[in-house]
Structures are given as structure tokens and as C-alpha cells.
Amino acid sequence: MGCYLKVAEDEGEEPIELPLEEDGTLLLSTLTAQFPGTSGLKFRTESNTFRGVRLADVKFHPPEDTWGDTVYYCVFLKGE
């Protein structure tokens, strides 16, 4: 059984579990297939502030080497 990451479009929305790759990363293409227009991910820290997730080589990398049981939220480009 693979590992999954809980992602929601925004706070208060129902999260969707997205499959992680074998190396523990999440592909940008996997995220945008479920949430078109998404350009990034963010999550709330213990201090209740948002923190962005690192995107490198079209893969999101887990913060501090683990995704944990946190719900991550989509980041969309600002209006043009």
C-alpha cells in the first residue's frame, strides 16, 4: 500500500488524498490533475502561520523530511 498526502483547496474544504512517489515526493502533475491552476502547497505550522512547501524539479519535497498527518493547502497564482 502506498503513502498518501492530504490536500485541500482551502481551509474548511474536504481534503483529497494524493499518492506520493516512492521517494516520498509529490509530483506537481499529480497536484494539478486534481487542482487545476495550482502552483504550490502550504501548511499551517504549530505557531499558526503558513509555511510554503519546497518545489524542485517538478516535485514537492516533504518539510523536515516527513509529511506527517498535516493537511496541506493549494496555492494558486494571483489574478492577472
Residue positions per predicted region:
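Phospho-regulated scaffold assembly regions enriched in serine/threonine/proline and acidic residues
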Residues: M1-E80
